Amino acid sequence: MKNNLTTTITSGKFKSKKLSLPSLSTTRSTKSIVKESVFNSLQGEIYGSVFIELFGGSGLMAATAVSNYAKKGYAIELDRAAFNSLRENFSRLNDVNETLVALHGDTFELTPKILAQNIEQKTILYADPPFDIRDGFSGIYEKLYKMLEKLEANIVVIEHISSHKPSQNIGKFALYKSRKFGNTTLSYYTKCI
């Protein structure tokens, strides 16, 4: 049976384009109010950046970043069915420069490799791991923090369950802002100089 769930890009050059959403049994789509908050907060940072969406799902955040003139957008997704939706979404939006890249695999393995390929670029990481209350995902935030401690990026945004208290510092990153939206919170980190 074909999944008919969709979401819409609401700004930039892809405005009004629809993306297919993977099954809600395997992913949790970012709420519109949360997405809008991220892009309002990062408005001055997106242009010309490399935007990497960890735990990519439909690729909505990476696609919205490229829609708002990020140089390149990556989305990493492990679940095969979700990745198929992601790849289809990006193939409908991509231009000849292949500005959107869908990657099937483990976020914890692929993120350092993508960053290594874009070492000279301004990079923004957007992490939306499955909330740790889901089966098989306890400890996901600690695992994410451990990976981030070893990485170089300019900005990191983590979407997490509001009951989780985010770390003030993660390696070279310092928390500079949090915004709560009911059960979801966005925590913003910047690279300490």
Positions of the model-derived regions?
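Core SAM-dependent methyltransferase catalytic element
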Residues: 177-193
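Short, glycine/acidic-enriched loop or turn micro-motifs at the edges of active sites
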Residues: 56, 80, 109, 131, ...
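Conserved SAM-binding motif I beta-strand of class I
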Residues: 72-77
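Mobile, glycine- and charge-enriched loop segments
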Residues: 42-52, 107, 111, 115-127
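S-adenosyl-L-methionine
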Residues: 1-68, 84-121
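S-adenosylmethionine
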Residues: 114, 118-174, 180
